[in-house]
Design a protein with these regions (language model features):
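Conserved MFS/SLC helix-loop-helix module at the cytosolic interface between two early adjacent transmembrane helices
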Residues: 86-124
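Helix-loop-helix hairpin linking two adjacent transmembrane segments in secondary transporters
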Residues: 162-210
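Helix-to-loop junctions at the C-terminal end of transmembrane segments
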Residues: 88-99, 288-301, 385
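C-terminal transmembrane helical hairpin of 12-TM major facilitator-type secondary transporters
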Residues: 302-347
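Intracellular juxtamembrane helix-capping segments at the cytosolic ends
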Residues: 140-152, 342-355
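Cytoplasmic helix-loop-helix junction between adjacent transmembrane helices
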Residues: 130-168
Length: 421
């Protein structure tokens, strides 16, 4: 888990260079969360995020049922990620202005409706549209991350945020497993049906668990959105974190969205259940990457970001042999998820440090960039897979890793521009 307790409110010059700062709650928000509540928030976050990633293991099933090629069916997964990015940009800033509890409950209802629409979609373009809508309303997990922070005491805040983020990552990866098994047994429409049905107990749990959120700003919605660009423009740590994590997330999704096609074709000829099963392996890697949070506290986020970029790039070097070796595929999955999760933790820590009172807006910028990168990664990698096969995916991942390294090292380490309070 993340351990932000080591990050102090007032930084020494050395720590400022590494971008360390305490994630402070809004002073108006009471710290009321028990560990059991935070754990339930993590479960809710993990359950909702599966709406975005449940499609990936069943893409070959959708392609076969609707008689479309891989490049076209990949748009279903890409639409979900793009919709998620839109939701992050337009809905997440509202958490600084309005009651987050009402936002979360409304979005879960929307997720139920769009998942049901996807299950009943008559054609590929209707499915793409439903997937886009499902993505927009499924940004609930990123509403819960700052919610967990402001509900916790300062000494527990890092653990609370880390618990919710770990729930998100486990939901992403295990959601693929469940999707693969259900899709293999009952067809791809059943996957969306299960997602829709699951939103009912999730809504009930959220309604019972979440307290009323206290706004941290009185800015109008228009001014909230207008304040996003200056945050990115004026603060280099936010800009760099956005770009680097967008590139790493593009790598992450380029692999996962094409894994089912790799396994379905020669030499493996394995079905969607196998593709989903790799989610368990990836979840192990994501849990192991909690060490990255500890390293962020000790060494500062910049050094951990650099290590994460190297790990992700190394993962694609291992995955180059995935067409002929399941062992390399398994190892590559674990290494990839460790690298991406460590990057997510360290980049987000660095961005949040700029202004703790604008966590909703910073999170909106950061996660919008992240999932926009993921959506582009899906679309581009689908074309590469169709044209060049698995080699195209591997080269794509390595190139993105090198670009991320260039962005990260283009600016010399110096005192971070910490928000003046």
């Amino acid at each position: 888990m993340w351990h932000f307790a080591a990050l102090r409110r007032h930084l020494s010059k050395e720590n400022a260079v590494n971008g360390q700062l305490n994630l402070s709650a809004s002073p108006a928000t009471p710290a009321t969360a028990s560990r059991s509540k935070i754990l339930m928030m993590a479960i809710i976050a993990g359950a909702v995020i599966t709406n975005i990633y449940c499609t990936q293991p069943i893409l070959p099933l959708i392609a076969a049922d609707m008689d479309v090629n891989l490049a076209t069916v990949d748009l279903v997964a890409g639409a979900a990620l793009l919709g998620f990015a839109v939701g992050l940009a337009l809905l997440l800033p509202l958490g600084d202005r309005f009651d987050r509890r009402k936002l979360v409950l409304g979005q879960i209802i929307g997720a139920f409706l769009f998942a049901a629409a996807a299950a009943l979609a008559p054609g590929i373009w209707a499915l793409i549209a439903a997937s886009f809508g499902l993505g927009i309303v499924s940004c609930v997990p990123q509403q819960l991350v700052p919610f967990a922070a402001v509900m916790s005491l300062p000494g527990d805040r890092g653990r609370s945020v880390g618990t919710v983020v770990s729930g998100i990552m486990v939901g992403i990866l295990l959601g693929r497993t469940i999707s693969g098994v259900v899709g293999s047994a009952y067809g791809w429409r059943a996957v969306y049906g299960v997602e829709a049905a699951f939103m009912i107990p999730v809504w009930i749990a959220a309604a019972m668990l979440l307290p009323r959120g206290v706004p941290s700003t009185n800015l109008s919605y228009g001014r909230l959105l207008a304040s996003l660009w200056p945050l990115a423009r004026d603060h280099r740590p936010i800009r760099e974190s956005m770009i680097v994590q967008a590139l790493l997330w593009a790598c992450f999704n380029a692999f996962w969205v094409n894994l089912a096609a790799l396994l379905a074709n020669g030499p493996w000829h394995l079905g969607s259940a196998w593709a989903g099963g790799f989610g368990i392996i990836g979840a192990a890697g994501a849990l192991a990457a909690s060490l990255g949070g500890r390293a962020t506290d000790k060494r500062g986020p910049r050094s951990v970001v650099a290590a994460s970029i190297g790990i992700v790039t190394a993962a694609f070097l291992l995955l180059a042999g995935a067409e002929s070796s399941l062992a390399l595929l398994v190892i590559g999955v674990i290494v990839l998820d460790i690298g991406v999760q460590s990057g997510l933790v360290s980049n987000q820590t660095r961005a949040f440090a700029v202004d703790p009172k604008a966590q909703g807006r910073i999170n909106s910028l950061y996660m919008t960039a992240t999932f926009s990168g993921g959506a582009l990664g899906v679309v581009i990698s689908g074309w590469l897979m169709t044209r060049y096969g698995w080699s195209g995916i591997v080269i794509f991942g390595i190139v993105l890793g090198l670009v991320a390294a260039l962005v990260h090292w283009s600016g010399k380490p110096r005192r971070e521009d910490v928000f003046s309070r």
